Structures are given as structure tokens and as C-alpha cells.
């Protein structure tokens, strides 16, 4: 195991202090060797092997869910011609000041500027127009996992706000009817909900307000989670595009009756922020706490070697390793020439769910000591119990992480009809209050409460609030407000 960033050290910043979260987060990314931030382009970072393995396991989990629901994977070029990018005026207006442009090929100035993909609607939909001919070609459901580029002018932060998003999963679908497209939105929400649940990431789903929806969409459903500092992080979006892009890019199909109709479209995306939220929500003062599904190693074995029985201890460790591998468990035996205490700290920092300690006493007694990373507690088990016990413990750890994260998340949601209380609580978490539905009052809430309007609950629900705190009119909706990344 190469030490890319030197000796691994536990974070020096307490994770429990919300005011110090940013420093803790930066230290953990460095100490656990998730990313190297020293790349000489602002907002662009290097995935290190351990972090990249976590990323790959997260990506594969999502890829499986998409394939199971009939999505097919594609890969589009990174460059988009300027005329194509600007064809949908409302869409480009939302991205124009963030686009990276390629203007030269070598020393020669290009006849037309090429954009580094900020998102792929304008690249994909001209191809949809070529691929879709009749009703028999529908629905069409594709996805790709690619890099996207946005010239972020806000404070950049690894995995949270980057100029090169290295893990952008975007799905795009086309349908014959509006009803089928609406059903696709529901399916996308279900896919993401299941995905976040399995990673133990708690969330709310909200319909974004008109002034904050995806450019060119009819409406946007967004998933937000709550970070330890009280700010929300958008971790996924689902967009109902209707026929807007189909009309722009002439995406039509021939009906059974022989008529030409525009298709209805949806798109939905997830990025590196999933990994960021998983690190932030589950981590503690000792470093990462990884859900077993996506941990590079689910179990690390630390042989506590002693003269006279060294060989026998290593043989027993090899036996345990083989037993667990047969059960489908990812195991690492750490036989480095290093003190057990240093190894314990190292793997706690890395967030490995279970540690098995094997020494002379365990060898003599036919036992093993198992340490749970989530609870920081040890338990002794008989050697022959391990193949049954370890998978059960991994499953229990996943459930416990989900439960713990959800309980903490729900404590960060506040319901109030008082403007003064909303103003005070908005920095602590998510505030829910009444809203008349007007953009004027929504924007005023953002100004007066000091947060961003996340939107209204999805699926829609009746509001318990009587009045809009801004205008005093009848509340038609519950609205969510929070400070955001």
C-alpha cells in the first residue's frame, strides 16, 4: 500500500463541532487518501486509489439499478459545438457563464468554438432525432457516466463544488406520451431513493421553485441531504422536460396512425456529491465510517504477532481470510511490520467496517476479537463462528448507519410559522413553513430568512400551515428553506 500523502494521521479537528466541519472534511479527504487537492488547476482534484475504489463501488451500485430498470449505457463526446449548445436559449442561459470553451486546435483557431460538456442535453438530443423514427422505438432510456466541466466562481471544494465533476451520471429518456414521461419521473425518484437508502444517506425530495428549476425543464424534483454544519447539499435531480427540447431539436416519432408527434422527455443526474455526503454524514473523530456495500475492504485482519507462534498466527489469519472470501466478504490481512496500535488507527481512519484481531491468546482459545467501526466496540467470537457472524455484522452495521443518520437528519428539520424563528433556525438545518405560492413571497423569504428556497415536498402533500409568513395570505403549500452549498 503506497502512502501517497505521507503517514496517515487521525483528524485533529473534532467532527462533532459543526463550526469546524469544513476543516474536518478537508483533513479526512487528505488523511484517508480519498483525494489529492494539490493539482495545479483550481477546482480540479486527483482521485487516489482508496477513494477511487469507493467511487467505483458507488457507481456500480447505481449502474446496476439503472440496468435493472431498462436503461442502456452510452458514451458521448466531451465537446459540443457552440451552435448546438446555444440552440435551446432558456437552457444555455442557465449555464453560459460557466462554460469552458475550446477555441484552437493546435495553433489554428477553430471555425466554431467547442464547449467542454457542462451537461449533455444539447449533445444527446440531436442524436435522439436520428435514432427515434416510430412509436416502436419508444421508450428510449439511456445513461452515461462522464466528466462534466463548469467554471464555478464560488468557493470550490473537493467533491462538493468542482470545476471538473468527475462522476456525473446522467440519464435521458424519450416517451410517446406525457403520462409515460410522468411515470418515468416517478421511476427515477424511486431509483434514487433506493440508492440513497442503501448508502444510508437521508434525504428530502422537493419540487424546486420556478426560479430555481433546471433550465428548459417543466419542473425539477431535487434530493437534498443535511451536512453536519447545518447546510443542505443537493445530491440528485430529476427533470420533467416535457416537449421543450423535443421541439428545439426536432425529436419526433411516427404514431400508429401515421402522424408525426414530438416525444416527451425526462433527464436525471447524480454526481460526486454522493461520496461527499456519505463521508460527511457517517464519519466521526477517527475518520471515515463506510457502509459495508461500498467499502474497499469490509474486514481487515490484524495479526498480533508474538515470537514462537508467529507462523501459526499468520496461518490462522490465512484460514480466516479464506473462510470469509468464500462467503463473499472483501478481506485484507495487514501483516506489515508495524505495531498493532498503529494499524488499528490506520484502518479506523480508512473506515473499514470490521476489524478482526488475532493473537497468541486467540490462537490458544480458538477465538477472534471483532471490532465494529460504527460502535467502536469489541466482541469475542469462536473461530468457527466467523463465516456466519461476519456477514450478519456487516448487514447490521449497514442498518445501524441508516438508522443513526436518519434520526440525526430528522432532528435537523424544523417546522414553524414564525418569521423570527425561521430566521434563527435556517442556519441550523431545514426550515418548513407555509407559502402562498407566489414567487415574490418565495424570493422575500430567501432575503429575510437568509437561506434558499428548496421547494415544496415531493410527492405533493397537504400543508399543515395556515398562513404565508410573508404576505399573510392562505398557505397553499409547505415550503422548505435552508442554507445550501
Curated annotation (Swiss-Prot):
Cellular component, GO, one term: cytoplasm
The enzyme's E.C. designation: 6.1.1.15
One MF term in the entry's GO annotations: proline-tRNA ligase activity
Keywords of the record: Aminoacyl-tRNA synthetase, ATP-binding, Cytoplasm, Ligase, Nucleotide-binding, Protein biosynthesis
Catalytic activity: tRNA(Pro) + L-proline + ATP = L-prolyl-tRNA(Pro) + AMP + diphosphate
A GO biological process held by the record: prolyl-tRNA aminoacylation
Protein name: Proline--tRNA ligase
Class in the EC hierarchy, top level: ligase
Protein biosynthesis listed as a keyword: yes
The UniProt record lists the keyword Oxidoreductase: no
This protein's encoding gene: proS
InterPro entries (UniProt xref): aa-tRNA-synt_IIb, aa-tRNA-synth_II, aa-tRNA-synth_II/BPL/LPL, Anticodon-bd, Anticodon-bd_dom_sf, Pro-tRNA-ligase_IIa, Pro-tRNA-ligase_IIa_arc-type, Pro-tRNA_ligase_II_C
Domain of life: Archaea
Subcellular compartments: Cytoplasm
Note on domains (UniProt): Consists of three domains: the N-terminal catalytic domain, the anticodon-binding domain and the C-terminal extension.
Quaternary structure and partners: Homodimer.
Family: Belongs to the class-II aminoacyl-tRNA synthetase family. ProS type 3 subfamily.
PANTHER family: BIFUNCTIONAL GLUTAMATE_PROLINE--TRNA LIGASE, PROLYL-TRNA SYNTHETASE
Pfam families listed in its UniProt record: HGTP_anticodon (PF03129), ProRS-C_1 (PF09180), tRNA-synt_2b (PF00587)
UniProt function note: Catalyzes the attachment of proline to tRNA(Pro) in a two-step reaction: proline is first activated by ATP to form Pro-AMP and then transferred to the acceptor end of tRNA(Pro).
Amino acid at each position: 500500500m503506497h502512502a501517497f500523502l505521507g503517514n496517515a494521521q487521525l483528524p485533529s479537528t473534532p467532527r462533532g463541532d459543526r463550526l469546524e466541519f469544513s476543516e474536518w472534511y478537508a483533513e479526512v479527504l487528505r488523511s484517508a487518501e480519498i483525494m489529492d487537492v494539490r493539482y495545479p488547476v483550481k477546482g480540479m482534484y486527483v482521485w487516489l486509489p482508496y477513494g477511487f475504489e469507493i467511487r467505483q463501488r458507488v457507481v456500480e451500485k447505481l449502474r446496476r439499478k439503472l440496468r435493472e430498470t431498462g436503461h442502456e449505457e452510452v458514451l458521448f463526446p466531451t465537446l459540443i459545438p457552440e451552435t448546438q449548445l446555444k440552440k435551446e436559449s432558456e437552457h444555455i442561459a442557465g449555464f453560459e457563464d460557466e462554460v469552458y470553451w475550446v477555441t484552437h486546435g493546435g495553433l489554428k483557431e477553430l471555425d466554431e468554438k467547442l464547449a467542454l460538456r457542462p451537461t449533455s442535453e444539447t449533445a444527446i438530443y440531436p442524436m435522439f432525432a436520428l435514432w427515434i423514427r416510430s412509436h416502436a422505438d419508444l421508450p428510449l432510456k439511456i445513461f452515461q457516466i462522464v466528466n462534466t466541466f463548469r467554471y464555478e466562481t464560488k468557493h470550490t471544494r473537493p467533491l462538493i463544488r468542482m470545476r471538473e465533476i468527475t462522476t456525473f451520471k446522467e440519464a435521458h429518456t424519450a416517451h410517446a406520451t406525457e403520462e409515460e414521461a410522468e411515470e418515468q419521473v416517478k421511476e427515477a425518484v424511486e431509483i434514487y431513493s433506493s440508492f440513497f437508502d442503501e448508502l444510508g444517506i437521508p434525504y428530502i425530495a422537493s419540487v424546486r421553485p420556478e426560479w430555481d428549476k433546471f433550465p428548459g425543464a417543466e419542473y425539477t424534483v431535487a434530493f437534498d441531504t443535511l451536512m453536519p454544519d447545518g447546510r443542505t447539499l443537493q445530491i440528485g435531480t430529476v427533470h420533467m422536460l416535457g416537449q421543450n427540447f423535443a421541439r428545439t431539436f426536432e425529436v419526433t416519432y411516427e404514431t400508429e396512425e401515421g402522424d408525426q408527434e414530438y416525444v416527451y422527455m425526462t433527464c436525471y443526474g447524480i454526481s460526486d456529491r454522493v461520496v461527499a455526503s456519505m463521508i460527511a454524514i457517517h464519519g466521526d473523530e477517527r475518520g471515515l465510517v463506510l457502509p459495508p456495500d461500498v467499502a474497499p475492504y469490509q474486514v481487515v485482519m490484524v495479526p498480533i504477532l508474538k515470537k514462537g507462534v508467529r507462523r501459526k498466527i499468520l496461518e490462522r489469519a490465512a484460514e480466516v481470510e479464506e473462510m470469509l472470501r468464500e462467503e463473499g466478504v472483501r478481506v485484507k490481512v495487514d501483516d506489515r511490520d508495524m505495531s498493532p496500535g498503529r494499524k488499528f488507527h490506520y484502518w479506523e481512519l480508512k473506515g473499514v467496517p470490521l476489524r478482526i484481531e488475532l493473537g497468541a491468546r486467540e490462537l490458544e482459545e480458538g477465538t477472534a476479537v471483532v471490532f465494529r467501526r460504527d460502535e467502536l466496540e469489541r466482541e469475542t467470537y469462536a473461530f468457527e463462528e466467523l463465516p456466519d457472524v461476519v456477514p450478519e455484522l456487516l448487514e447490521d452495521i449497514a442498518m445501524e448507519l441508516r438508522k443513526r443518520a436518519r434520526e440525526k437528519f430528522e432532528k435537523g428539520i424544523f417546522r414553524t410559522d414564525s418569521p423570527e424563528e425561521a430566521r434563527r433556525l435556517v442556519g441550523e438545518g431545514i426550515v418548513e413553513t407555509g407559502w402562498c405560492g407566489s414567487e415574490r413571497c418565495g424570493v422575500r423569504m430567501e432575503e429575510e430568512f437568509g437561506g434558499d428556497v428548496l421547494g415544496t415536498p415531493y410527492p405533493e402533500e397537504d400543508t399543515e400551515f395556515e398562513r404565508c409568513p410573508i404576505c399573510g395570505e392562505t398557505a397553499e403549500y409547505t415550503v422548505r428553506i435552508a442554507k445550501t452549498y
